[in-house]
């Protein structure tokens, strides 16, 4: 019995129907500003009145807590191995943004098995009463844990920079997602943000370039959510362990994060008006199909 089937049985037995919006933020390579994207979008969502919890899914190398300047008492080890509830391991950061630590420097968290991943994904449903949006901040690359969260999420936000390696690795990540036997293109919607661009045109060109290849070879539709300019204020905020959206709301990057958050909320409103089901977790998706990926 695979993980997807286990989760569907859990839902049938417990009648769990999550309604919190789940957005998984990911990247093909490290160092592209993915975690900064996660925390600043969370802050912008809070400014819009949304309740937000971040799951730091970069297991063993978690850095959301560092960027928030917080010291969590608990992490996912306490959920997976100690039997604590997921609500017990939430740390509340600035502006009442909650986050769940993936465990920084904990070797056992860097190579979680499928049972542990199932436990984490299952427990996300229990956050429904506490939050409107769950942001899953994955590690970079195409590890099993990253792909499990991508196929389990209704929305994937891909962070890419103009660097050739970032573009190539982003395509490799999407190809791995496309080949995953449980990937459902009708369930998981892929969005992209161009980060650290010199201007708006560069961001649009970057998206058009990647989207053309993805559309041709993978047939995965992508939605462009906008770009974030290269801004020294971001690094200054990181050094002071305060999100730039709080430290300097007028910074170019902060304004860009705000526009992206607004677009993402508009996208959710459009879905609601069309009376489509909210995209949450894997066990609300259609049954998986066995498919052969040739490319």
Question: Language-model segments: what does each one mean?
Answer:
Residues 24-83:
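Walker A/P-loop NTP-binding active-site region of P-loop NTPases
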Residues 57-129, 239:
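P-loop/Walker-type NTP enzyme "switch/lid" segment
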Residues 138-226:
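Conserved catalytic-core segment of NTP-binding enzymes
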Residues 250-270:
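Extended, charge-rich low-complexity interaction segments
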Residues 283-292:
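Conserved small/polar residues in nucleotide/adenosyl-binding loops
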Residues 1-28:
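Extreme N-terminal, non-catalytic leader segments
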Residues 215-243, 257:
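Beta-strand-loop-alpha "switch" segments that mediate conformational coupling across diverse proteins
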Residues 104, 127-146:
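Switch II (G3) loop of P-loop NTPases
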């Amino acid at each position: 019995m695979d993980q997807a089937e286990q989760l569907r049985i859990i839902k049938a037995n417990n009648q769990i129907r999550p309604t919190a919006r789940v957005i998984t933020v990911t990247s093909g390579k490290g160092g592209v500003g993915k975690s900064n994207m996660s925390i600043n979008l969370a802050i912008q969502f809070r400014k819009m009145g949304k309740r937000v919890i971040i799951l730091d899914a970069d297991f063993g190398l978690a850095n959301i807590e560092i960027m928030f300047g917080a010291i969590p008492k608990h992490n996912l080890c306490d959920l997976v191995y100690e039997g604590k509830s997921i609500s017990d391991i939430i740390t509340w950061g600035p502006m009442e943004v909650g986050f769940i630590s993936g465990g920084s420097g904990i070797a056992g968290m860097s190579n979680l098995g499928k049972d542990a991943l199932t436990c984490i994904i299952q427990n996300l449903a229990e956050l429904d009463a506490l939050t409107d949006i769950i942001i899953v901040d994955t590690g970079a690359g195409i590890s099993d844990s990253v792909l499990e969260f991508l196929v389990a999420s209704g929305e994937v936000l891909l962070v890419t920079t103009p660097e050739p390696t970032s573009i190539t690795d982003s395509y490799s990540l999407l190809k791995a997602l496309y080949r995953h036997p449980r990937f459902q293109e009708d369930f998981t919607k892929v969005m992209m943000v161009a980060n650290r661009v010199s201007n708006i045109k560069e961001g649009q060109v970057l998206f058009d370039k990647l989207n053309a290849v993805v559309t041709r070879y993978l047939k995965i539709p992508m939605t462009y959510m906008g770009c974030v300019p290269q801004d020294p204020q971001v690094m200054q905020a990181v050094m002071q362990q305060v999100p730039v959206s709080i430290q300097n709301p007028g910074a170019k990057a902060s304004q860009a994060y705000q526009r992206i958050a607004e677009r993402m909320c508009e996208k959710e409103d459009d879905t609601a008006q069309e009376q489509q089901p909210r995209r949450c977790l894997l066990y609300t998706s259609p049954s998986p199909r066995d498919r052969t990926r040739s490319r």
